[in-house]
């Protein structure tokens, strides 16, 4: 089940040694792919260890990434802070992670992807164990920001590591296992802490969740095979920056970067403050309100159908259908009735995953010679949207309530629809 954090086509995909035209810079080592050992094949013990190791890397990292989202109402009550301030515990992580993804991807070309994955997962979850000791909001936000910095190595390099080490014929299966780990990890990071609130405070709930994330990291370290096909490359930051600059001058890519920023920001904003609505307006206990994150399961259907729709009717049509579902879902989510509101949330969830599945794949297709940089920039904008809009939406919710929050998010979605339409028209003109 892909979640907003973990579509396989949105991750920088620099894998095995590539030529200069693919990276925008000459390789530091002329070793050819033919001189490297064959990629791991399904049925080999090392293949299964690799797939399981990346499964646990996803479980650990995406658990840690969103571990405070379901705890935000509890943080507001315990610390006497506003929802916008509580949202900083999510925005700090995703914002710093967004800024660190591209440097981490480039650095991994020199230091090795496996080492970076191990360090990132272990260090981030160890820091997570210290978060319950934070004396106040300031230190908690600092700790969450540090977690975001450390976590960046996993989404920036995990899929590239798989593409590097696994035989191409068996790669989709391994990728699917990793994506499943991301999805389940993200759900655990939301459901487990909220469920524990019925029996304990936020500190205990967070400590238990981070203890589990650390256990996932340790398992990953123990079973991760040694890299066999890694070839270090010289760092060419200027060349990378020139490539990224060219991508922003392409209106189709720039539009898709904006689509990722807006729709991810809207999606995270809705779920950041949905718990407050369920608890304060409808009287649900925190443990029951946390079950709303199960609506993420709509992402399974949406991502698959979005891909099929893009293949059958075109990416432009598919992305606009997803955006339309968001436009329909938000007014329904504003209704003051629980059983009417939840289908609206489900519709927006479905629409978001459709948009994300199509946009992330479209970015790679538009930049075949610099796919890694384009996918990395999409991820950067995607997580920045989560951070910036997730925080700003907290001020709207605190000042004007749920209905105004839905209007604000609807306005953002309409801007996203405009960008998506511009991308679709531009793509049609180029095709013609």
Label the predicted regions.
Residues 35-45, 225-257:
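Juxtamembrane intracellular "pre-TM" segments in multi-pass secondary transporters
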Residues 80, 112, 133-139, 335-336:
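Helix-breaking motifs and short loop linkers at transmembrane-helix boundaries and internal kinks
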Residues 99-135:
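Conserved MFS/SLC helix-loop-helix module at the cytosolic interface between two early adjacent transmembrane helices
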Residues 101-112, 301-314, 397:
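Helix-to-loop junctions at the C-terminal end of transmembrane segments
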Residues 127, 138-147, 339-347:
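Paired small-residue
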Residues 139, 168, 177-224:
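Helix-loop-helix hairpin linking two adjacent transmembrane segments in secondary transporters
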Residues 143-182:
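Cytoplasmic helix-loop-helix junction between adjacent transmembrane helices
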Residues 316-359:
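C-terminal transmembrane helical hairpin of 12-TM major facilitator-type secondary transporters
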């Amino acid at each position: 089940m892909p979640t907003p954090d973990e579509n396989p086509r949105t991750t920088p995909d620099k894998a095995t040694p590539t030529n200069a035209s693919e990276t925008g810079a000459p390789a530091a080592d002329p070793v050819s792919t033919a001189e490297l050992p064959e990629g791991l094949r399904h049925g080999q013990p090392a293949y299964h260890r690799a797939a399981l190791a990346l499964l646990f890397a996803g479980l650990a990292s995406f658990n840690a990434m969103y571990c405070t989202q379901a705890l935000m109402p509890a943080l507001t009550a315990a610390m006497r802070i506003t929802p916008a301030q509580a949202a900083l515990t999510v925005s700090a992580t995703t914002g710093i992670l967004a800024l660190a993804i591209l440097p981490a991807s480039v650095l991994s070309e020199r230091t090795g992807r496996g080492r970076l994955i191990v360090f990132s997962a272990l260090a981030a979850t160890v820091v997570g164990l210290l978060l319950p000791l934070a004396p106040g909001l300031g230190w908690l936000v600092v700790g969450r920001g540090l977690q975001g910095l450390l976590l960046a190595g996993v989404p920036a390099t995990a899929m590239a590591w798989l593409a590097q080490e696994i035989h191409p014929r068996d790669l989709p299966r391994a990728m699917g296992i990793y994506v499943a780990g991301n999805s389940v990890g993200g759900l655990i990071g939301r459901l487990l802490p909220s469920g524990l609130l019925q029996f304990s405070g936020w500190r205990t709930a967070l400590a238990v969740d981070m203890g589990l994330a650390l256990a996932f990291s340790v398992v990953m370290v123990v079973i991760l095979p040694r890299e066999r096909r890694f070839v270090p490359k010289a760092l060419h930051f200027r060349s990378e920056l020139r490539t990224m600059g060219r991508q922003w001058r392409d209106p189709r890519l720039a539009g898709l970067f904006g689509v990722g920023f807006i729709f991810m920001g809207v999606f995270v904003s809705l779920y950041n403050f949905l718990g407050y609505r369920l608890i304060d307006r409808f009287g649900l206990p925190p443990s029951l309100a946390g079950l709303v994150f199960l609506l993420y399961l709509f992402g399974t259907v949406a991502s698959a159908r979005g891909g099929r729709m893009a293949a059958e009717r075109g990416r432009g049509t598919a992305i606009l259908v997803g955006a339309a579902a968001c436009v329909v879902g938000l007014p329904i989510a504003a209704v003051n009735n629980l059983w009417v509101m939840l289908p609206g949330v489900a519709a927006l969830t479905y629409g978001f995953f459709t948009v994300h599945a199509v946009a992330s794949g479209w970015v790679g297709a538009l930049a075949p010679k610099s796919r890694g940089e384009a996918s990395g920039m999409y991820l950067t904008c995607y997580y920045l949207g989560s951070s910036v809009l997730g925080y700003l939406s907290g001020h709207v919710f605190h000042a004007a309530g749920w209905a105004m929050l839905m209007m604000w998010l609807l306005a953002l979605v309409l801007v996203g629809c405009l960008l998506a339409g511009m991308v679709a028209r531009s793509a049609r003109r180029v095709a013609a």
